[in-house]
Structure formats: structure tokens, C-alpha cells
Amino acid sequence: MNMKKLIIILNILSLFILTGCENKKDVNYNSDIKVNGPVLKISLIQTAYEIYELHIKNTNNEPIDNLYDGSSRDAKKHYKWLIKTYKNLDSDMIKRLENIFESNSSWAYINSSINLDDSSSTSDIVNNLISDKNLDLSSDVENDIEVFFNHFNNEYFNKYFNKRKSSLEKKASKLNNILYSNDVNIEEFINKVCGVSLNTNYVCTFYYSLNPISSQNFEYENYIISTISPNTTVKDLLRVPFHKYSHALFDSFNESDEFLEICELLKADCKLVSVYNDSNNLAYDFNEWCEENLVEGFSKYLDYRYSQYEYDFSNFVYDLDFYNYLRKINFNPDKVNLKDACIDFYMTCIDF
């Protein structure tokens, strides 16, 4: 074998490795999805909250460290950095950190900053938070935000962030190369599976975060924004748009008499009601809770149809059951529409 042929073969093998040896007929990825490296407007707040959650919020000393230890080597290093940084904070800074996140959640602060430019500085972030009336900050907390985040970034976070940023930007570039080279439209795929036409014009944007154990989702205008952990794969990215697009499908019938009637009957379902009550009713009313179980189940089904990923875990009460139901009936919109499939499924839950 001459050297030229060897180089060609090696190039082909490297392409298969990069794409995970997937058959493009089975797994295709939407090039409308964009992956970015970490940005300060997210990671500064998110990482400060991790320190708060580990050392201040976790008053019961629950073994959160197990979540980091069970993730990856980088996750363990990140956990050690969080521990070391907290130990170096003086009592005044710890109190300011506590005041900040007792006043608002990490999500609320990042949501306030999410439409800032990706190159925004600490000063830009602080000024935005202080001026945001929706956060309803007291003058004391405004001062805490200004003092703490500037100190935290200058003394600890800036060096750590820049050290991690380069490698995560390289990962983002690799994922984008895969996404762009497999130019398939998720919306068109859903239209084919469901037999309906969507026109959502959503733009899905992902930002790598330093947090290895959790993610956050945000929306503004037509943008769907999610943070992703450092070990996220291309397949993981698809689950967010699948869930969001599913909501658009359910919007076509979630106010229909038939759907509202089944939601009323489900108020007799002890398990569904119990989990709903335990969630403090903050995110949904009961009808929306019934819908959310179906949406999550349907998004799982879409992911299965798209990538052949088989689910065995539940996020709500009936999402996994609905996913399995759709697989069992081999859901076909030419035979049964989505609304009828949802109502038929919930009727089996009520009958049981």
C-alpha cells in the first residue's frame, strides 16, 4: 500500500470517529442548532451559585459531592476548585453570596443577563442586574451584587474561567462541524412524524458551562437557549428542541373541550395530583401539568424515532408511560392524530 492510499484511508477513518460512526439515515442533526463556548454572562453567575448551593444552601450536608465524583475527571477538578474557592472567601463575601441567592435564583439572574452580548464584562453583567426592576432587588442586595461579583471574578473566577474556556470552545467547534455536515431540519422531521406543519422559526443555541451536573434553559424572542455540561454529546443537544417543538404541537389542542375534560377527570388520579402538589404548583396549573407529562413523553418518542435512543427513565409521572404507549401503537398520524392519542392514553390511566 503506497503512502497516498494510506493517508486517504486514515482520513476516512477519522471522519467516522468524529461522527461517532453513525448511519446518516438513522441519526441526522439540524445545522440550525449552534453550540458556543462558555460566556461570562452565564458562567459567572452559575458558578457562584454552585458555591452557594454546596456550602450555604445545603444545610443538611447532603452528599452533593457524589454527583461531581460520578461525572468525570474534569467534574472532580471543578468540585475541588469550588471547595477551595469557598474556603478562601472571607465571612463578609460569604454573607454577600448568601444574600444574593436568597433574594433571587441563579436562573432569574442569568435570565436577566441572557440577551447581553456574549462578550459582556463583569461590569456589564453587574450593571444589568442592578438596573433590572423585575429582580426587585433591595439596595443592600444591589450593593452585594456589585461588591461580590467584582471581587469573585477578579480574585478567583477570571483565571479559572479563561483556563477552561479554550478547551470548551474547541469542543463547541467540533460539535458545530458535526451539526453543519449533517444538514437535516428537525422541524421537517417532526412535520413528517406528526403529519402537521410547524412554522416556529426557533433558533436553538447552546452554551457550554463549567457546571458538570445540571443545565438551565432560557427563552427570548425566538431563541431557545440552554447551557450544557462539558461532557455533552451531539445526541444530547437534540432533546431540548424536541421538547420545545412538542409544545408547539400541543398548543393546537390543549384548550379543546376534549382535552380539558380529560384533565378534569385526572384530578382523581392520586399519584398525578400528589406529585403536582409536591412541586409547589409554581411552574404549571394542573391542566398544564397534565400536558407537560405528555409533552415530555412525546419528545422522548421523537428522540427515539430520530436517533433510536431507548428511554428507561421518567422525568414526571406519565411521560415514560406515554412514550412506551406511542411505541406500542406505532404512532402514525395517518391512523390517529396526536390529540386522540393523548386522550386515549390518559383514558387507560383513568381506567387503571
Task: Explain the meaning of each model-derived region.
Residues 4-11:
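Sec-dependent signal peptide recognition
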Residues 17-20:
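C-terminal motif of bacterial Sec signal peptides marking the signal peptidase cleavage site
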Residues 84-181:
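Long, mid-chain structured domain cores
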Residues 160-218:
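Auxiliary, metal-adjacent structural segments of Zn-dependent hydrolase domains
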Residues 171-180, 228, 280-286:
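Second-shell loop/turn segments in exported
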Residues 235-256:
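Active-site recognition of the HExxH zinc-binding catalytic motif
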Residues 297-352:
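Pan-zinc metallopeptidase signature
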